[in-house]
Amino acid sequence: MVGENKFDRHLNRNWETGVVSYPEPAVEIIEESFRKYVIGNAGMERIYTGCRWAEGPAWFGDGRYLLWSDIPNNRILRWTEETGSVSEFRKPSNNANGNVRDREGRLISCEHLTRRVTRTEHDGTVNVIADSFRNFPLNS
């Protein structure tokens, strides 16, 4: 079973065929100060496993999809709400980590590997917005 662990065996879950809804019993609050951020009536789903670590989610409401970075695997992934499928949006991503949309709906990303901030245009081309500050390269 993909991603099997002690919680999967205990709860008889199979991540290949289903999604677990909140409250997710396998989510453990390690730092008690975080508990105040848990909203009892808010939904939470695990939509993907397989990232070494993930961050930088950016929601594209008009297209009903979510982009996020899988930094060590050097890719940006895309989850589509309609189908629930996950695909690669961009690889290599130059280890992009922070992502956000601009006012025109384009993706802005901070690239760790190239030490630059880029904008992905609607046609998929990538343009550099910034790669230095006061003649010094960005630091990450």
Question: Which positions does each model-derived feature cover?
Answer:
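Sequence-structural signature of mature extracellular/luminal beta-sheet repeat domains
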Residues: M1-S140
